[in-house]
Amino acid sequence: MSGSHKTAKRKEDEMSEIIKAILFGIVEGITEWLPVSSTGHLILVGNVLKPGLSDAFMEMFNVVIQLGAIMAVVVLYFHKLNPFSPKKTQKQKLLTWQMWIKVLIACVPAAVVGLLFDDILDKIFYKPLPVAVMLIVYGVLFIIVENRNEGRKPAVRRISELDIKMLLWIGAFQMLALIPGTSRSGATIV
């Protein structure tokens, strides 16, 4: 193969990888806002598209691509999330701090399990079959829970109504989301 053909082939491969990255971005952009696992969908799309990249790079890519969604939330809800906002009253600032404390408490169970078992979970569950199974299981669970709760009023309407026991239960369900194919918001909803 001549030098110009190699260069053309390399450019074609690079363009193909760019298109794959755009497709990953579209999948992330859509699934991050729904009660489905965006990480699970990225794993499945990666299995279909088979980007010519190392597993370590794809792991990092899947984390970095989610930063866009995180930044969108921060920008969209900055006033609500910021306890230092000069536009807030003292009471609003206090409520914002209380919200952050409750978020941290709810994160404890998943953080502990994630730190202790991350490598094991990665080896077992970061594969297309377990991801697909979890997506199906949670899809069925959502339908069951939705039908069971139809017409019921929510037990909690405000963050201020959450006590430590309920926060730890939320955190326990967040542990389920350590398994790809399990939505963080979906696990909390169930």
What are these regions, as identified by a protein language model?
Residues 2-190:
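Multi-pass membrane proteins that catalyze or facilitate reactions on polyprenyl-/lipid-phosphate substrates
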